[in-house]
Amino acid sequence: GAMAAGLLVLAACGSSSKSTSSTAAATTTAPTATTTASTSAATTAASTAPTTGSSTAPTTGSSTAPTTGSSTAPTTGSSTTGTGGGKATAGELKDICPAEIKIQTDWVPEAEHGFLYQMIGKGYTVNNNDASVTGPLTASGGVDTGVKLTVLSGGSAKGFSSDTTLMYADPTILLGFVYTDEAIQNSAKFPTVAIESGYNKNPQMIMWDPATYPNVKGIADLGQAKVKVRYFGGAAYMDFFTSTGVLSKDQVDGSYKGDPSQFVADEGKSAQQGFGSAEPYQYEKIIKNWLKPVTFQYINDVGWKNYAESIATIPANITKYSACFKKLVPIIQQSTIDYTKSPAAANAVILAAVAGFGNNFGWTYDQGAADYAAATIAKDKLVDNGPDGVLGKFDIARVTDLITKAIPVYTAQDSPPKAGLKASDIVTNEFIDPSIGL
């Protein structure tokens, strides 16, 4: 039912689209989705996401969409102006950016995307055909920048295609979430450049039942105890763990698709991939046959230091839209700070979007899940300053370290990264405002 599907998605969060489909982006088939896709966002959704069944989409109809949210969206972000810079002026993106900036996320709306929904101002509309939310792109303090922002859902709404695939298929999508390891993997055939780091710490984790394994304190202990670990097949971090001896190949199971039923059926005997900002709440509060705590360790804490949900684009756009990015990136930096400090307004937009989508994408999400995610993002410093106290800035040495670790992993997977790949090929700090930090 919808509930299982909803949890399904939570489990996956960024992970399914990132890890399973990033490989899809590396195959030559990905860009062929292009032809019709660029005509409109709706066609993209239809062409890439047969699974969601466009037949159900129109039933809820856009008639209900505009009402959702226009009333509930408070002046996003006016409660805190944050610190440092980020003071935008009215209309400042008009004429230098596309009239509608489309940003592709990697899942259906959830609090992990809050820093984007934070920029959607009053009078937004929810489109339940293509799972998007459109409103005036509003900077910190309620400043209307003069362009529209459309936040596009991913995951089940886009047939689980990776954002890299979707950006190459539809050039009207200016920006999308790309994890650093995915950028490394696709650097030879489908390169992307990230212009803002997103999550300084990837929310992905491995979780286990503390009642079954009271002595397990981390992922390496799961390896020692030979516990079965379910994950999304193709995830590079897992190949890193098995090739470096953290886990062994015979204990990992790549069949996981986000459904909680196997974890529940195993009664705590197996471990599983998830998001630290999502599953612990779901399993303790919502999954009826579980309803007890789980314990977890973040993947970043075991050496695979990935940035998550970085804001990235196709390389040609770096020059083409440099004037736009120079103004837009500081707005994203400040929006991230505003959301982290005061998530209520953007969470209201997220919940309105989920309600507006109805059952079209098999996603359920509630206030408790949104509140838990926002609190965890702050508490566990998933959003945090980068080098020099600057939010959104990439640590080039850290990216270089991940490239070094990832090259043998992806080469073994038959999707070798670009020869001689450097951090500057996949990330840039050129548009970052150094005065903006938490």
Segments predicted by a language model, with ranges:
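Extracellular mucin-like PTS domains
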Residues: 19-84
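Short, solvent-exposed loop/beta-turn-alpha elements that line the ligand-binding surface or hinge
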Residues: 125-144, 296-304, 319, 381-394
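C-terminal motif of bacterial Sec signal peptides marking the signal peptidase cleavage site
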Residues: 8-12
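Short, glycine-/small- and polar/acidic-enriched structural segments
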Residues: 84-256, 263, 270-273
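Secondary-structure end/capping motifs
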Residues: 321-413
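Pocket-lining segment of extracytoplasmic ligand-binding domains
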Residues: 181, 257-360
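Conserved C-terminal helix/tail region of periplasmic/extracytoplasmic solute-binding proteins
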Residues: 78, 87, 396-438
